[in-house]
Regions:
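N-terminal flexible segment immediately upstream of the FAD-binding catalytic core
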Residues: 1-58, 68-100, 129, 152, ...
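N-terminal glycine-rich flavin-associated loop
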Residues: 8, 31-63, 85-128, 140, ...
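A glycine-rich phosphate-binding loop feature that marks nucleotide/adenosyl-phosphate handling sites
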Residues: 22-25, 71-74, 130-137, 179, ...
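C-terminal substrate-binding/cap subdomain adjacent to the FAD-binding core in PCMH-type
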Residues: 31, 139-141, 145, 149-375, ...
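Extended, hydrophobic alpha-helical segments in both membrane/secreted and soluble proteins
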Residues: 63-65, 72, 113, 262, ...
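Long hydrophobic segments that form regular secondary structure
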Residues: 214, 222-242, 260, 266-283, ...
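Iron-sulfur-cluster electron-transfer modules
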Residues: 387-390, 604-727
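Ferredoxin-type iron-sulfur electron-transfer modules and their immediate structural context
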Residues: 389-390, 465-470, 477-619, 638, ...
Length: 727
């Protein structure tokens, strides 16, 4: 590993991280898995990427392309050299307003792209719930969808072309238009189109007919029925296993600024599922589910409580959020009226007299719509805010079926959960038959890992019975690739392997995903692996609301599910240090991961009190932004106190901390000797000389000491009325 780092340092300009702490921060994504990478490179250019690929081939190591690290299926963890595109490789290369298209680097965040497009009246509409931190490269690799796919389609429908490196180091343009193809690319294209023609009948028979299908490779893009065949669509959804993206051309859409929302209330979950197939006939741009568990949990989160109280009437078991957006805003009232009439026709009324209880809350205020959208986009994280060791686990969460089968499918899956002694939490995309459901399990327990396996087997059998997709949005990764034979058949698995072999014969790119996958329940790959435990540690604060060692300190740390909400770059206050550095070390998620690895002994002895841990916490300004905005309630400012207390107990209090902490004690003396105290700011070189001793940076002046204390009668304001403060 050290040898790999030494070689890379001579050949790349980007940042390299090979220490244990940094590698640990990239060992997890938002899935249940953990795999320690060999090292991390944040490339600054295509030259850096080309050099990294060359070195990887020479040294026999794998490459993992990573964006926001928000994968829920383990796509972005591997024992590989990780290339983090999000820090530097993230710009807009071209913007063609006339033809409504743009070309971007893979590391650009969706929200950042849409902020740049908004002044031009355009946007990229694959509006995933993680838009504040999801990168376009990651979305393309996953074939992401978003809540408005009913109108705008998926990533595959909105990616026009991709520039990418192949495993041999050659770079090519995948798309219908562009420079004349090289002979190597033409041969590859011809091979793939022959393959598509050969397997067209099998593909038609085996691929689910539902809109939401992201499992396996998009080899249906190669069949004669898909002409013109765009090989970029084969790369979309390939999870970084076929090529390394360097530029992605996107289709843009006009912004429909006016929209309205109808919040449909149902007394039972089954009623909502049955109604979805009828509501979509009104042509909304989205129908999203919120179940009673999510409503209850959201009420306990300060930032969502008022929204719930304003929107929810009575005690519904489920809500369907039906959104309309029209170029002609005068049609909105017509749409809402039609929605109310349909709910009545389906047999619902607010009174419940002679009909089932239910109705529509109309939301026309854009600010309230925005708050509801924030609540819905935080659905996963709200579900994860349970404080016990049992958490909603992602492994069958986005299966998709046809809308007429949705009610029966959800009822069947609920029976499976009950059979295994657990329950599911439901939310997301009712309009396309793709609901997110996570059974509550404790994956620290072997019995619950076995339960997870059994639920997965039975769930995918149920999906196959309804001819649905076992992966409707979140991809394959480590959690679902194993089941491709069950869902697609042995011949299709062989086809996927053939494509992988043609593009990447030596397995350079992200091995173990889509093809040649390990067992999904191999605990050696889990975040909570065999022997995972935290020894008892002394803590100074009350952590009794959580479980685990340190009086619950462990459980509070483990509340971080790696969703990455702290990586947002605009809006709110979380996380200020990350917004400046854009480094994983300086974001709440990175700090929480470091703490978890430290207290469980995965970073070596005394990791909690080490200098590397102090550096991890150094730029946390204790602003409590995470406490107020993290949907799972991670309070890094409070955790930092424990780290500082443990470090002080072991190493004593530093001079820097003493100078800050004891300021009130020595301030009167410094004031009297202000001419000496202020020398540090005025004498050339003195600030630099004292920097290492005091810990105060030489690049900034310290506050100037006054020889006249402000409480002195000479400087105090006179003749002011007395004030009484009631505290």
């Amino acid at each position: 590993m050290t040898h790999l780092a030494e070689i890379l340092r001579t050949r790349v300009q980007g940042d390299l991280l090979f220490d244990r702490f940094s590698r640990g921060r990239y060992a997890t994504d938002a899935s249940l898995y953990q795999m320690m990478p060999l090292g991390i490179l944040s490339p600054k250019s295509e030259d850096d990427i080309a050099a990294a690929l060359d070195v990887a081939r020479e040294q026999g190591v794998s490459i993992l392309s990573r964006g926001g690290g928000t994968s829920q299926c383990g796509q972005t963890v591997n024992e590989a050299l990780v290339l983090d595109n999000s820090q530097y490789f993230n710009g807009i290369l071209q913007l063609d307003l006339e033809n409504m298209r743009c070309v971007v680097r893979p590391g650009i965040v969706l929200d950042e792209l849409n902020r740049a497009l908004k002044p031009h009246g355009l946007w990229f509409p694959v509006d995933v719930s993680t838009a504040s931190r999801a990168t376009i490269g990651g979305m393309a690799g996953n074939n992401s969808c978003g809540g408005k796919s009913l109108r705008y389609g998926m990533m595959r429908d909105n990616v026009l072309s991709i520039d990418a490196f192949l495993a041999d180091g050659s770079k090519h343009h995948f798309g219908l238009n562009g420079p004349a193809p090289s002979p190597e690319y033409q041969t590859l294209s011809d091979d793939m189109l022959r393959f598509g023609a050969r397997e067209a009948q099998e593909i038609d028979a085996r691929f689910p007919k539902v809109m939401r299908r992201v499992g396996g490779y998009n080899i249906d893009a190669l069949t004669p029925g898909q002409t013109p065949n765009n090989l970029a669509h084969l790369l979309v959804g390939s999870e970084g296993t076929l090529a390394y993206y360097t530029a992605i051309e996107l289709k843009l859409w006009p912004i429909l600024s006016q929209k309205v929302l109808g919040v449909c209330h149902f007394a039972t979950f089954h009623q909502a599922m049955d109604a979805a197939q009828h509501l979509v006939t009104l042509h909304p741009q989205g129908v999203e589910l919120v179940d009673s568990t999510m409503i209850s949990l959201a009420r306990d989160i300060p930032m969502f409580r008022a929204t719930i109280e304003e929107v929810v009437t009575g005690k519904p078991e489920a809500l369907l959020l039906v959104e309309f957006a029209e170029e002609d805003a005068t049609l909105h009232s017509t749409r809402l009226k039609a929605l109310e009439e349909m709910m009545g026709d389906l047999g619902y009324s607010w009174s419940g007299i002679g009909k089932a209880w239910g109705g529509v809350t109309k939301v026309t205020d854009s600010a309230l719509q925005g708050r509801i959208a924030d609540l819905r986009s935080s659905g996963l994280n709200i579900m994860m805010s349970m404080k016990d060791d049992g958490k909603p686990v992602s492994f069958v969460e986005d299966c998709a079926v046809e809308l007429p089968d949705l009610a029966a499918y959800t009822a069947g899956l609920t029976e499976i959960f009950e059979k295994h002694g657990t329950r599911g939490t439901w939310y997301a995309h009712a309009s396309v038959g793709c609901l997110h459901v996570r059974p509550v399990l404790n994956l620290k327990l072997d019995k619950d890992v076995k339960t997870m396996r059994a639920i997965a087997e039975e769930c995918f059998d149920l999906v196959a019975r309804y001819k649905g997709s076992h992966s409707g949005e979140h991809g394959d990764g480590l959690v679902r690739s194993e089941f491709h034979e069950k869902m697609f058949g042995a011949r299709m698995v062989s086809n996927f392997a053939e494509v992988k072999k043609r593009f990447d014969p030596n397995g350079l790119f992200n091995p173990g995903k889509i093809v040649d996958a390990p067992k999904m329940d191999d605990r050696r790959l889990f975040r909570y692996g065999p022997g995972y435990a935290a020894p008892e540690i002394r803590t100074e604060l009350d952590w009794s609301a959580w479980t685990g060692s340190g009086g619950g300190f462990q459980g509070a740390i483990e509340m971080c599910n790696n969703n990455g909400a702290c990586r947002k770059l605009k809006g709110g206050v979380m996380c200020p240090s990350y917004r400046v550095t854009r480094k994983e070390q300086d974001v709440t998620r990175g700090r929480a991961n470091t703490l978890r690895l430290a207290i469980t002994g995965q970073l070596g002895p005394d990791a909690l009190t080490s200098e590397a841990m102090a550096e991890t916490m150094k730029l946390c300004v204790s602003c409590k932004g995470c406490k107020s905005e993290c949907p799972t309630g991670v309070d890094m400012a409070r955790m930092k106190i424990e780290v500082q207390a443990a470090r002080a107990q072991k190493h004593g209090i530093s001079l820097h901390d003493r100078l800050v902490g004891y300021l009130p004690r020595y301030a009167p003396w410094a004031s009297r000797l202000s001419f000496l105290a202020n020398l540090r700011n005025s004498v050339p070189g003195l600030a630099r000389l004292t920097e290492s001793l005091t810990g105060f940076t030489a690049t900034r002046n310290l506050p100037v000491w006054s020889a006249h204390p402000f409480r002195n009668d000479e400087v105090a304001q006179q003749d002011q009325p007395k004030a009484v403060i009631f505290a």
